[in-house]
Amino acid sequence: MAGFASRTRGVAAGGFDPTANYKRIDFVTMSSTGDATNFGSLTSNREGPMGLGNETRGIAAAGWSRPNSNNIQAIDFVTIASTGDSQNFGDLAQRTNYGAGAASPTRGLLIAGNIPAPGDMYNRIEFITIASQGDAQEFGELKHCLLYTSDAADEERG
């Protein structure tokens, strides 16, 4: 599941249960308690997408699609303050899932994950400029391949 937030909303996108993937996007209002509300849908069902965002935009990238077992290369975005379906942002260089995302207010990093060959892990880091749609670009590589990573970021650093 991809997660991202603004100061007022927390958003979760995608996910799975043992039989299916989901493309649903839900949100909560940070200042109150209660159940999540439907925000919209991703462009495709996906398990294990990477999430990142800034105060304005949320990004859900990559993932894995059941039942055809395909990794996804697409990057989707939403405007956090509104509701509605995601739109296409661009593509990653490699189809991957279960990587991590991190962001500053301007740049997002899409980090590592699992690639299509069974059991292969990916050590590449790609970046996007959150305000501008387009394909991810090479940022660098991790020293080691990682899978099922986690993410964190603040106002200054991813």
Where are these regions (language model features)?
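A detector of repeated loop/turn-to-beta-strand junctions in beta-rich toroidal repeat architectures
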Residues: N21-R24, A36, N70-A74, S86, ...
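Conserved small/polar residues in nucleotide/adenosyl-binding loops
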Residues: Y148-E156
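Repeated scaffold domains used in trafficking and secretory/extracellular systems
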Residues: R46-M50, T96-A100, L146-L147
